[in-house]
């Protein structure tokens, strides 16, 4: 009798789980909406089993993903109640529930992840992975919890600029893995720009033959060295491009992780690389002169539509991003074809001429069941009827679009541009400038307070942008992305009332270790210097609050508060972005105190 009892106890320990009394600290990024804990833990054994009631194809993909995870789970063919982990599709609670929601229950009897969709189960599994604390014997200790979770925003994005510096297919996949861990669901892929064309277009092979490589090792050298392109076999050629098969492979890899890839094809500006290859599409008709397409030339529209047809065949995303930013409109003012177009269409200025192009591109995309997405400059000259605005020059563009009943993705540079320095610039690798800390990213609320509840509903999400002018290596790119992307992930997913900076920072420290252990190259948050120490203390000097006379005026965008800035005893932070530095442009500083 005693022997049988011992055997039974041994079976319980080696089978589904063992209940421990040690509590486990719960740290999840992004922070779930609701976490209820019970004292004790659950031990997940080696090669524990799981079941899933997902439909066949989706279920097979999900099972393969789960089995490849560090937990070592094995798909069970037995009844689900006998499995250590059960993944269960359930009916949504009501029509307003997010399809990405999930519930994760860990009890002394096992683990149940339930959700109304495969995406929800996937995100529940990501939470389970973050909770799992590996033991030395290959088992995993898990806290007893009941987590109910759903995203705040439907769009949770990361932008990757691969024009300034090309990234390999493997690098992109690696970032998709990290995005999945932190429940981000959109990769905005900046494939074309003046620094290089990165996508194979079969109708126009010259684009990648003549504009995907540069005779310099990095963007900075190229920018200073004449900004010319070269072929792949030219001496010192640097760059690359994605074949259509490469792009499809990445799209599929992302889809299996519930990530949508949105391609960006720049127009009408940022197109030097196209116009070097096809100068007849520019206003001058000469290579290396213009950055903007000639909107008066009908061949421009033929070219763009042909390109977009191939792009849409590769990318099934609802959105196609057309850029629309930073166009230099001077050439249009002097171009006979552009002026003829303006007269024929009754356009009053060149901003309306750009809007004409955006309107035509939107109709073309809509005719192919796609939606146009563009930077906030597409507001100028009149917004296309169904366009979605990506607000980067602050929030003003997003506010204007939301008030006009247009969908908006918020990505203001002040909070979302990860190419800025993240710590003391003297201790960091080169960046474009600025100073954007983890804490500042975390502080961002994508819904401006000035919007009404009805207007705020048009804010569909938020995105981190990584422009790559000064980021030449993949290691440097990851250093700029992580851990700030984790803060953006929590901004995008977690309701504001559930956010807590100190708790998040401790969680981020843990995740930095995870990222390092898995081959990423994040900024070491444990060594963060923080704000410039001198900026925290008032300086006493003989000129304190004395009268001051400016012989040369300071720039209106760098006032630092006005005339008293130089005598108020307050010093600026690491960069002018804190609005505490007074600046003088195109003139020497001449001041008398």
For the regions a protein language model found, what residue spans apply to each?
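Feature activates predominantly on carbohydrate-active enzymes
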Residues: 95-319, 360, 364, 463-467
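Flexible, acidic glycine-rich loops studded with aromatic residues
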Residues: 372-377, 382-387, 393-537
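Flexible loop/turn segments at secondary-structure boundaries
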Residues: 58, 166-168, 194-200, 268-274, ...
């Amino acid at each position: 009798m005693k022997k049988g009892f011992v055997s039974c106890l041994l079976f319980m320990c080696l089978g589904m789980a063992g209940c421990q009394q040690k509590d486990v600290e719960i740290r999840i990024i992004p922070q779930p909406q609701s976490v209820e804990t019970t004292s004790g833990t659950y031990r997940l054994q080696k090669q524990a089993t799981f079941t899933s009631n997902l439909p066949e194809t989706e279920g097979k993909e999900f099972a393969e993903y789960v089995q490849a995870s560090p937990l070592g789970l094995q798909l069970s063919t037995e009844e689900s109640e006998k499995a250590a982990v059960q993944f269960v599709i359930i009916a949504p609670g009501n029509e307003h529930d997010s399809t990405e929601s999930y519930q994760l229950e860990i009890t002394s009897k096992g683990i149940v992840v339930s959700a109304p969709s495969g995406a929800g189960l996937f995100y529940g599994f990501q939470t389970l992975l973050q909770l799992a604390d590996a033991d030395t014997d290959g088992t995993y200790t898990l806290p007893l919890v009941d987590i109910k979770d759903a995203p705040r925003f439907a769009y949770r994005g990361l932008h990757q600029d691969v024009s300034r510096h090309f990234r390999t297919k493997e690098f992109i996949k690696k970032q998709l893995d990290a995005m999945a861990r932190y429940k981000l669901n959109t990769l905005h892929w900046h494939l074309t720009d003046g620094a290089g064309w990165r996508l194979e277009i079969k109708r126009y092979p010259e684009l990648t033959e003549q504009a995907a490589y540069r005779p310099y090792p990095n963007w900075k050298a190229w920018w200073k060295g004449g900004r010319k392109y070269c072929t792949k076999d030219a001496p010192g050629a640097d760059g690359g491009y994605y074949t259509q098969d490469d792009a499809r492979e990445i799209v599929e890899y992302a889809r299996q992780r519930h990530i949508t890839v949105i391609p960006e094809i720049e127009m009408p500006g940022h197109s030097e690389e196209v116009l070097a290859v096809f100068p007849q599409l520019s206003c001058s008709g000469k290579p290396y002169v213009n950055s903007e397409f000639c909107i008066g030339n009908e061949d421009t529209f033929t070219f763009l539509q042909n390109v977009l047809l191939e792009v849409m065949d590769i990318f099934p995303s609802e959105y196609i991003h057309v850029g629309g930013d930073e166009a230099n409109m001077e050439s249009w003012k002097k171009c006979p074809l552009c002026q003829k177009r303006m007269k024929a269409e009754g356009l009053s200025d060149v901003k309306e001429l750009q809007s004409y192009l955006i309107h035509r591109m939107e109709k073309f995309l809509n005719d192919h069941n796609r939606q146009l997405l563009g930077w906030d400059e597409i507001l100028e000259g009149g917004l296309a009827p169904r366009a979605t605005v990506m607000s980067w020059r602050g929030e003003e563009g997003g506010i204007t679009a939301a008030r006009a009943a247009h969908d908006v993705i918020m990505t203001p540079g002040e909070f979302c541009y990860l190419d800025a320095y993240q710590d003391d610039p003297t201790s960091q690798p080169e960046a474009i400038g600025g100073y954007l800390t983890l804490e500042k990213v975390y502080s961002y609320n994508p819904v401006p307070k000035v919007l009404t509840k009805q207007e705020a509903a048009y804010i569909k999400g938020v995105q981190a942008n990584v422009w790559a002018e000064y980021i030449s290596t993949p290691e440097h790119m990851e250093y700029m992305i992580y851990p700030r992307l984790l803060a953006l992930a929590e901004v995008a997913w977690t309701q504001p009332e559930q956010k807590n900076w100190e708790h998040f920072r401790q969680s981020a420290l843990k995740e930095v270790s995870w990222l390092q252990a898995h081959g990423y190259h994040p900024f070491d948050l444990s060594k963060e210097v923080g704000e410039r120490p001198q900026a925290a203390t008032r300086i006493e000097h003989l000129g304190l609050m004395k009268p001051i006379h400016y012989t040369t005026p300071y720039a209106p965008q760098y006032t630092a508060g006005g005339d008293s800035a130089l005598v108020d005893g307050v010093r600026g932070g690491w960069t002018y972005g804190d609005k505490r530095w007074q600046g003088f442009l195109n003139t020497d500083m001449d001041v008398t105190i």
